[in-house]
Amino acid sequence: MILNEWGEGSYIEPHKEFGFGYLDAIREVFTSAPKAHVDLTPADVGLPVPQVEMTFTSKPQWEFVRDTYGWDNGMNLDNPRIESGALTAVTTGNDPAFFGPPVQIAASRYRRLRLRMRLESAEQQFDDMGQVFWSTRSLAESESTSVRFPVHVDGKWHDYTLNLGENPRWRGVVTRLRLDPCARARVKVQIARIELLP
């Protein structure tokens, strides 16, 4: 039965505050049904929506030998491409970022991220900060869903391992990763590999 109480229409249904009281009143006024009855409700009323864990068909690992695997989208980067077996770009601003492809990764299975990266500046050698962000089905990408790590801008290859699991917001199903390789302009970035580890 559909009611048109306010003009937009509504269903007769239990009320959050008053439960089945409104329905009981309608039954008593308009029917000859006995007062004794059972109110039926789904067993999962009031429970949180379950997070269904979808699994990666293979290990979440990207080797940038011939393909960008969707990591060629970003900001403050000039011409992300594969060059010399690495995802390569030059930063054009102080907040460069590689946006990863859409994924469905159970955070509980992978608590660390490891990447092999080389940063080079024509001006000088220096240390800087990188950052990895993530979004989940219930959390948007933000400072609170990120981990910072020190990087070396010295033209040499370095392996960086980040403990994402230390952040309490690394949970649920991760839907995208974002890598900020540094926080400077005019830095050549080369990434050979990004992988998630248990």
Predicted regions and their residues:
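Extracellular ligand-binding interfaces
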Residues: 87-168, 173, 182-190, 195-196
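Short beta-strand-to-coil "C-cap" segments at the C-terminal boundary of structured domains/repeats
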Residues: 28-33, 192-198
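Short, exposed beta-strand/loop patches in secreted or surface proteins that constitute
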Residues: 73-83, 88-90, 151
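Substrate-binding cleft of secreted/luminal carbohydrate-active enzymes
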Residues: 1-45
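Acidic, low-complexity intrinsically disordered segments
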Residues: 65-75, 82, 184-195
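Extracellular carbohydrate-recognition regions
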Residues: 39-77
